[in-house]
Amino acid sequence: KTAISPQIIHFSTHGYFIRQYQEENKKICDCGFDVKSTYFDSPNCGLILSGVNNNISYNTSSNSADDGILSAKEIMQLNLNNTELIVLSACNTGLGDIHSTEGVYGLGRAFKIAGVNKIIMTLWQVPDYQTMELITLFYNNLLIRKLCPRKALHEAQKTMRLKKYEPYYWAGFIIVE
């Protein structure tokens, strides 16, 4: 898996996170796929992309570079030093294993190691329609109003609040700088 380092990267997909104590052979994520935990690389989180059904439907591992899974381990090996912002419009992308003295090991850390400056991610499962609305507001604030990413997200969340959406629909999005 190779990537260039554009200024902004946006993923609108499914994220997964496997807790360390998760038993093998159980459903490992709330992304709709029932696969064995041994299939995934460590660290135990990533993004599910197109092509994943080709491997998961047979419940086998693939050594192919295009297996449909972008794991945190693979992300850490990318050079994204020129990427200012990555938006992870996917469930649970802000989760990870907590290490007492080192913080959270998850997608946020993986993208930081790869060189990304700012990361927008989620702390829980986010509903599709409201996520689309929030992200549309965010990009309007970022690209048209020329707000910085932190302010653009804050203003988008404020608009969702003014539209009387419950916090569940918008508060799960955070930015890590």
Predicted features and spans:
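Catalytic cores of enzymes
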Residues: 1-177
